């Protein structure tokens, strides 16, 4: 089974019950066709970068799942005919590095870069500007 991620945006006008029904529908399509859902993340309602189907906001969801490759065509077909999903993106994780990232994302672990503290620097000496002394004579 391959590792996948499905991000989809629902209309912001849906009630909580309708949102739950749409998410359950997508989860059902995945499980009925032989997929295993690892995690579902609700990212909340956010402003869209640009207007999509006359909507400026949308409710974001991400589903991480494992599935046979044949499921992707069926899932795409079902998501496209669902009018309440205004946009979706499906991502396939292939190599070991990507699969490791998929597993971290499923667990909700954010990748952080550990920075080692730098050694303290010696204090700088105050800068003194030398001005050439010029003598002016009156004529």
Swiss-Prot record:
Molecular function per GO: small ribosomal subunit rRNA binding; structural constituent of ribosome
Gene Ontology cellular component terms for the protein in this record: cytosolic small ribosomal subunit
Any Pfam family: Ribosomal_S6
Comp. bias regions, Basic and acidic residues: 114-133
InterPro entries the record matches: Ribosomal_bS6 (IPR000529), Ribosomal_bS6_sf (IPR035980), Ribosomal_S6_plastid/chlpt (IPR020814), Transl_elong_EF1B/ribsomal_bS6 (IPR014717)
GO biological process entries: translation
PANTHER family: MITOCHONDRIAL 28S RIBOSOMAL PROTEIN S6 (PTHR21011), SMALL RIBOSOMAL SUBUNIT PROTEIN BS6M (PTHR21011:SF1)
Family: Belongs to the bacterial ribosomal protein bS6 family.
Name listed for the protein in its UniProt record: Small ribosomal subunit protein bS6
Organism the protein comes from: Campylobacter concisus (strain 13826)
Biological classification of the source: Bacteria, Pseudomonadati, Campylobacterota, Epsilonproteobacteria, Campylobacterales
